[in-house]
From Swiss-Prot:
Chief localisation class: cytoplasm
Name of the protein in its database record: Ubiquitin-like modifier-activating enzyme atg7
Annotated compartments: Cytoplasm; Preautophagosomal structure
Organism: Neurospora crassa (strain ATCC 24698 / 74-OR23-1A / CBS 708.71 / DSM 1257 / FGSC 987)
Protein family per UniProt: Belongs to the ATG7 family.
Biological-process GO terms, alphabetical: autophagosome assembly; cellular response to nitrogen starvation; mitophagy; piecemeal microautophagy of the nucleus; protein modification by small protein conjugation; protein transport
Record-annotated active site: C550
Amino acid sequence: MDLKFATFSSEIELPFYSALFSSKLDHDKLDSSARPVLGLYEPRSHASPEASTRMQILGSALTSDQDESGPLGMTRAEGYIKNVNTIEEFKNTDKNAMIKKAGEQIWDAIQDGTIYSCPSLLASFRILSYADLKKYKFTYWFAFPALHSEPQWKRTGPIGRLTSDESTALVERIGTWRYMVDRREHGFFLAKKVRREAAGPRSSLDDPGVDIGYRWDIGSLRDFETGFFNDAAEEDRYVAFVDPSNYPEYPSWPLRNLLILIRQRYRLNKVQILCYRDTQPRRHEARSTILPLAMDQVGDVELKCMPKVTGWERNGNGDLRPRVANLAEYMDPTRLADQAVDLNLKLMKWRLAPNLDLDAIKNTKCLLLGAGTLGSYVSRNLLGWGVRKITFIDYGSVSYSNPVRQPLFKFEDCHNGGKPKAIQAAEALKEIYPGVDVEGYALSVPMLDHAIHNEAKTKADFDKLKELIDSHDAIFLLMDTRESRWLPTLMGKAANKIVMNAALGFDTYVVMRHGAAPNDGSEETLGCYFCNDVVVAADSMKDQTLDQQCTVTRPGVAAIASALLVELLTSILQHPLKQHAPAPVSTGTGSAVSYERDPPDHPLGLVPHQVRGFLSNFQNMVIRGKSYPQCSACSKPILDAYKEGGWEFVKTALASRDYVAELSGLAEVQRLAEKAAAEMQWSEDEEGMDEEEGEGELI
């Protein structure tokens, strides 16, 4: 009777897809080289015959090394997966060449004897796949390469079975043998019966239980060539393999390659195959079968060339076509969002910026002072870069003029006086991406030249602001007024934080990073927003007309400035010195000004100090400015007084901007300027003037 075989069918655990997607995105990138993958199979007595021969790919299949074989009782199979970059590459891959190459690996191992070190190659497989990382679809095709026997092996007698006692003794012997050999040998082995008269008296080391009249001896496949069967009768010799098939008459797929080994290495054309289907917990069930096989006589048992190879898996409809797994149907939406947010960022590392440190950006905790137009755009850009921690501070409410310019708010947010901006901005960001850790605080930032009406509340606001600045890495100054930025500038410099600032005009903007305290003990650093001021910031809202009270700018200015500000932050985070990175120095003059990367391998380019933009002529200027020794916000006297006095200093400063001017030295600068102006004599060229009028000087 011709021998038929039960083919393997693939069974992939969901975690494997995630592991493969992650590996492709983070490690393999454009590399589509085949990489090892571990397959597992096992006898499953409870499964129907059609569902019994499963090649299982567990979640850890990509990372399991050669010493691992999965859960107890499972047999390993050696596999490779080739995950290509496009669906067209998947379609155009030469499938015949691929399975032929897999068959050659088995054939060569049989020919040179290395199969004895890794018998699990006899159950090897290949996977051709394409992972669509955007749509979470996985197109794949398994191949289980099988070498054809020609002439075919045939069953020469009835299928044999073991008794329950024989099966129990066999399972115990196999279990003992497996402890002594490599796990790759567990699926294929030799077995023989050693009769009692040959074995001598029964010892305490023999199988426990009922005396079956013989004992089982188990050996590795290589032992055949060293005389393992020499002392056993022909009817007591078995070549065995772990058989997951539950078909009564059909053994599983790995037997096909084992029969080639038997012919090539053992030079046999007649053999008893032990289809080992028993397991330790159910060893008494005696499910294993014995197949007496033989093939027609041939002139030379040994094959001269590799036989035909087949084995591509059929899909669920029985067609020789690949399968498609739509993972979006099974994955948690929040987890899908997490992976989707990181997708475009990780793709940057494939070709364009392989040295980009995405974790440095992702783990940066950002505090946004202002949840209006700038705050809305900045927060969305931070989300785009994968930032996971964002906190808003704003004391205002959403008004009807806001939603069209501030993308975090809707019309409904304006009703009944408007929702608190900071709270609503946080909720909106959470709706956009549930994985973000976002909070909002309706907090009034104490401002210079604004009277303190409730000292307890103002101090509480100051304490909360200090707590938030201390617990974040990057501070964004995005408020409407100049004086509202003074205290956060001072506190950010004192805490040695990254301080980012954006300010808007009608068609102009400035985007800058504040200089951090130097690491080398020197006083020179980059300037802050206030370093160009010659007077201390005052109440800019006093006696203002409506067009001066509102932020009147061209609508696109805020989006441009916000994008540049976030891009500047990411460039800072890629620099080895972070906020202490020096500003680039220009080379060349005029229209030929250029800048060199520092360091040269910076993945994003320059880390400028300031970018000033002019929408009227669509130009940007990169500017570098030193800190001003008499700055009202970041000079040494101001910093020292704040560090020493804390709230008491702030209270005094808020109440009297003259105090800040005197302490910083700005007042003295003004006095010296006035004195110089008073002493300066203005003269005009006397040529051509009417001397009779006597007007030669003007004081």
